[in-house]
Amino acid sequence: MADERKERYINPYTDFGFKKLFGTEMNKELLISFLNSLFCETKKEITDVRYLNSEHLGDGYGDRRAVFDVYCMTDDGGRFIVEMQKAEQDYFKDRSLYYSTFAIREQAPKGEWDYHLDDVYTVGILNFMFPDNEYPADKYRHEIQLKDTEDNHVFYDKLTFVYLEMPKFNLTEDELVTMFDKWMFVLRNLSRLLDRPKALQDRVFDKLFEQAEIAKYSDAERRQYEESKKDYWDYFSTMKTAKRKAKKEEKVETVFRLKEMGLTPEQIAQGAGLSIEEVKKLIG
């Protein structure tokens, strides 16, 4: 693994990095390999993809739009929305479902139609874990479909959501077995690597490490990447600030609630997780 002070390869969690590796015609073999690794047991092999317009407008003026990181169609007509989710956000699942409707609605032709739909897949690469320990600590790949809640039978198999909880993936280089393992390792660790791991000698990774090496970029590409990296850092800084502010506000509310209950400053401090001095400043 790399010295954290250096960076040889781009960070795929940045907008520039993700689209450089997966969102260009030149690198579509990387996207094909990644998607095949996700569905090797449940879907026939993808041999080609065609990139589609990643920006979608609503049906009428003023309707909300959706902008996907990567949107493509496979050789068998299936549509894939691939999203890199930097941080947890409210109503993430609702947003994911909403985005999938664009890939469904655009299939409706003008004129007569029998309602036949091609498969729609939404792939979410999550740089966070689902809240409240929703899934076991060792389960980081989730494949979701519409199912009967009584017998778990698949009711509709043409709408699929795959979510990857990246922070849960902790396999070392020596533990990588499947192509899925290798792609997860790359996504999790690429920007921290100084050398190509011996476990990643498959031909497709020749292309990946070539395209990910910052030293080979033009001056313009380097500037674009640095700007994208700055946006990535700013985003996390803003999120951390918001969380600290929310936590502080929660403690203040706790202080006044405990005060109304008649507790002493010492008891309030213990209950709110603050010092006695901080409590006294708040309650006067």
Describe each region flagged by the PLM.
Residues 137-144, 177-183, 227-229:
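Short intrinsically disordered coil segments
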Residues 2-7, 80-85, 181-284:
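Short, charged alpha-helical interaction segments and adjacent helix-coil junctions
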Residues 148-155, 178, 182-187:
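Low-complexity, glycine/alanine/valine/leucine- and proline-rich hydrophobic stretches
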Residues 25, 38, 167, 187-190, ...:
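Generic structural signal for hydrophobic core residues of well-folded globular domains
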Residues 1-162, 170-172:
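Accessory alpha/beta interaction modules
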